[in-house]
Amino acid sequence: VVDIVAARPIDLAIVEGIESMAGGEGPWIPRVRPNRPGLLVAGTNCVTTDAVATALMGFDPMADRGAAPFETCDSTLRLAEDAGLGTRDLKRIEVLGVPLEKARYPFRG
């Protein structure tokens, strides 16, 4: 993903969080449950937009390998930040609309 964004920067990033699922990768997983946070996140930088969406899901966008949601993989947010594509530091991201504290919706399995 980082290589693709580096090769062709994204002009508008949208994360659709109107309806989703948690607890697994699909409906075939017995513990999967529906989530209906009713949120849309949009921005002109895909790294910052994804960092905000990650935080809205109850995860720390500054987390790295070994911490949720990156328990078994490298953080694509860190890789993108290291490549100079944007920041994952919420203190450096301007958020408009509903404050993060009010919009958070826990997605933990």
Each model region followed by its residue ranges:
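Acidic/aromatic/glycine-rich contiguous surface patches that form carbohydrate-binding/processing clefts
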Residues: 1-109
